[in-house]
Amino acid sequence: MSYAQGIRRNWTQFSLQLLTVFAVGLTIGAERNVVPVLGRDVLGVESVFVVGAFVMSFGFVKALLNLYGGKWSESYGRKPVLVAGWVVALPIPVILVLAPNWWWVTVGNVLLGVNQGLAWSMSVNAKIDLAGSDARGFAVGLDEAFGYGGVAVGSWVTGVIAARYGLRPEPFYFLAGVVLLGLLVAVLFVDETLPYARAEADEETTDEDADLPFREVLKRATYGDRTLLAASQAGSVEKFVDALVWIAYPLYLTTAGLSVAQVGVVVGVYGGVWGLLQLYTGRLADRIGRRPPVVAGMFVAGAGVLLTAVVDGYWLWTGAAAVTGVGMALLYPNLITVVGDAAHPSWRATGLGVYRMWRDAGYGFGAVLIGVTADLLSTAAAFYVVAAAMFLSGAVTLLWMRETHPDREASSPTATDPAGPTDTD
């Protein structure tokens, strides 16, 4: 059987992977708008830090499963790991419907972290396997566009359902249907894509980086390579923004007088702009390089967060959410592509797993920072702190990240290295 790469050549399987990641996005989006308000208004949680515990559990578990999911997929294949991710998600709607206290919700989000860590990781790896190096940025852009488009739709749909029928159980019936759909597509229609990555690895002309042991990949992607370190820290800090949207936006905006349905629109605009623009920003990075959109995105997203705390009113908050979404669209798919460029095909899934581990640990770190800041100072103060973190991280990225685009790498200026780790790729 031929394992020739290319999106058009493999369009049927690529489309199924897009459907899969859309379902993954719907799953997390179904929680994003409703669950924090459920904790405050139904389960009686007053501390923002405690509300944030469900994001902490999600983030740290997803981070760990990202790491091992990539490793497992190179041993057992992408499809078994994808199916396992959907099986683990089956109890989540039941837990959310029946939860008598907030800690049940926190446990449910542990399962959500497993689902997202396995299912989304395998979906993006499969698209990279199918697309090949020439269309890698576009493939990742499509993946993230459909995934975060799903987040936006899930947030909006559950907001509408909650506004009409209540915070539970009806919104979580929608979630149950999404999980079943994702599982059926993964089991019945998705094919294994690992052979495409192996065929690509066989064609590599330079093999000095091939077949690195797991520990060496972990070391390189964490601190041994300056560019991968820059990507990992940027990925971790940008998740502070997403944690803020998940934890603080519903609480901050409903306290300011917006309805749950209106909050769903604000959060949906953030996710929708982020998702749709990635159809363009991934391809943009294939044309102009990865580094410019990543650096610009860090500062634009930080500005959007800052703007949210400064303005007042439904339409202004919606506009600020759109600005934040633009920044995330610029940086998010292209950070993944940077890692995909820098990694050898034989250990690319593991390298992406290490990056995604540090990136999604940012949910946990961000939830701690947001919760402590909100409880000690105010919810508004958490917006200022997250914006400052984005600006600082953007500066680090500007200094340390080199260009990784295969056609631009040799001619691009080298990033400044203030006694940091060396580039080894």
Predicted regions and their residues:
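Symmetry-related core transmembrane helices of the 12-TM Major Facilitator Superfamily/SLC fold
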Residues: 170-187, 383-399
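Helix-to-loop junctions at the C-terminal end of transmembrane segments
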Residues: 65-77, 277-289, 374
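Interfacial helix-cap and linker-helix signal at transmembrane-aqueous boundaries
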Residues: 39, 72-73, 160-166, 253-254, ...
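Structural signature of the two symmetry-related core transmembrane helices
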Residues: 80-94, 292-307
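Helix-loop boundary and gating motifs at the non-cytosolic
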Residues: 8-59, 227-230, 234, 239-256
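Cytoplasmic helix-loop-helix junction between adjacent transmembrane helices
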Residues: 108-149, 337-338
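Juxtamembrane intracellular "pre-TM" segments in multi-pass secondary transporters
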Residues: 1-11, 192-231, 416-425
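Residue-level signature of mid-helix packing/kink "hotspots" within the transmembrane helices
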Residues: 59-67, 151-152, 271-279, 363-364
